[in-house]
């Protein structure tokens, strides 16, 4: 199974890249976590939030892996526990289905992308920095896989 994390934004602080890479490399061979950075649209100079979202949407659509289950992060999405993530991951692994998880830009994601999503997922009711979201997702994927493999990383 391949999980592709499509994140609008580039040039993250080194600690973000290092923490993300650490969790990604801990995963077993049957679960690959790949990061695809999507160039954000510059704002200002007549580029409205709507135009920026549209440009980022086009880039995201071009980068989406074909036939992958689409999970889009959204503040109005479902709020899963780690165990719910593990349960869903178990089903996706059994189906052999690849996953694409989208972290939108500063102004969010296009309504079209949200309507196309198989799952809208909320990580927190709080606003989180994009770099932190990358690390949090990588850690939660690792934790969910650890649960499925009976590894003692997660404690109930």
UniProtKB/Swiss-Prot annotation:
GO terms for cellular component: cytoplasm. Its main location: cytoplasm. It comes from the Bacteria. Its EC number is 2.1.1.177. It catalyses: pseudouridine(1915) in 23S rRNA + S-adenosyl-L-methionine = N(3)-methylpseudouridine(1915) in 23S rRNA + S-adenosyl-L-homocysteine + H(+). One of its GO terms (molecular function) is rRNA (pseudouridine-N3-)-methyltransferase activity. It is found in: Cytoplasm. The keyword Methyltransferase applies. Keywords: Cytoplasm, Methyltransferase, rRNA processing, S-adenosyl-L-methionine, Transferase. S-adenosyl-L-methionine binds at residues 73, 104, 123-128. Belongs to the RNA methyltransferase RlmH family. Specifically methylates the pseudouridine at position 1915 (m3Psi1915) in 23S rRNA. Homodimer. This is Ribosomal RNA large subunit methyltransferase H. It comes from Laribacter hongkongensis (strain HLHK9).
């Amino acid at each position: 199974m391949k999980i592709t994390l499509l994140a609008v934004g580039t040039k993250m602080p080194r600690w973000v890249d290092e923490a993300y890479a650490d969790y990604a490399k801990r995963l077993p061979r049957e679960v690959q976590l790949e990061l695809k950075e999507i160039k954000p649209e510059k704002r200002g100079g007549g580029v409205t939030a709507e135009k920026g979202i549209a440009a980022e949407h086009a880039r995201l659509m071009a980068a989406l892996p074909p036939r992958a289950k689409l999970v889009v992060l959204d503040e109005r999405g479902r709020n899963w526990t780690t165990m719910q993530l593990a349960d869903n991951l178990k089903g996706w692994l059994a189906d052999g289905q690849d996953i694409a998880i989208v972290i939108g830009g500063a102004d969010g994601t296009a309504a079209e992308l949200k309507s196309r999503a198989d799952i809208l997922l909320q990580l927190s009711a709080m606003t989180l920095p994009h770099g932190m979201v990358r690390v949090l997702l990588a850690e939660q994927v690792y934790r969910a896989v650890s649960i499925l493999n009976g590894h003692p990383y997660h404690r109930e």
